[in-house]
Amino acid sequence: MARSADIDINAGARLDRLPTCGFHWRILALIGAGMFLDAFDIYLAGGVLGAVLKDGWSTLELNAAFVSATFVGMTIGAWLSGILGDRFGRRFSYQMNLAIFGLASIAAAFAPNMMVLIVLRFIIGIGLGAEIVVGYATLTEFVPAASRGRWIGLLAVITNFSLFASSMVGLWVIPTLGWRYMFGLVGILAMVVWILRKSMPESPRWLAANGRADEAEDILSAIEAEAARKGPLSAVVASVPAQESAGSVWRLFQPPYLARTLLGSLLHIVVGFSLYGFIGWLPSFMVKGGHSVVSSLGYTSVMALGGPVGSLIGLVLADRLGRRLSIVGSSIAAAVLGLAYPHMADGIALAAVGFLLVTAIYVMLATGFAMHVPELFPTRYRLR
């Protein structure tokens, strides 16, 4: 007889009892590769916009339209990924969004003018926004609850290293080969990851929650067999899942989820405004202020080191101080440094304070956006 409910197979409890094994590292690598390229694609905008502005190919107004198109697309993508991920599965959603931003990035490398590039950037943004939502949520559903903070922290480190990587790659590629190669590079790599991700299984938690218990059992059995090679598995602690169905998205705006939704939305707004508003515009402002493309990318690269550093700090603080205290502390630090940054007169001070500011922002990103928000909601609402 086919199984029909999570209570029959105990998907969550069986995943939570597993020791770390090769399966978990493969999942981290596959999700991390897509998330890295997603963030790389987002952050390459700063260097590209500085270059097209310097070349006279664009204006500040068109650059603003480019940035706006990116985030309108990301907003739509994040919304759609939640609906599609809940309806058709996590696997469908993360493959679709990777294909969207990969193919559109390749097309952007051949854009004949800035207006076409802006339209393509909007399409890219749809894929970028979806990947961010699906990536963190999917890893949350695969790894054990006891070590989830460390796994999500590692994913945040991988993802946020892309800020430094995109700055360093741009520092060489843009002045020597041109900005188009930045889009071509990330697009081709995204399609390589898309092929590799075809081997990634669906989330057993999602399958069980959607009445596909036989498929969930097959995946769980394979994972358990691999984990059992390290030694006997601990006993499963039975858990009774909530019987509430996913229902409408408006359920998120009713108790007990209303407060969580407001908190999650606030964290996303603060992190998004701080991160993308500051980093995305920085090279353009420097070029407009008289700096060369190379020097502006150099300053940005130094500040970009705060991405992986902040993520590592967030990984440590989340387990030692807890999510909430880490979020509050990093938010205060980012606010103070943000007020001080415009008053820096020389390049060294500008880079130093900028590095500290980016570090604080990424501590907030790693602990709030990556770790805390996905844990606020159960499987049936996690992608919404």
Give the positions of each predicted feature.
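Transmembrane-helix signature of 12-pass secondary carriers
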Residues: 1-384
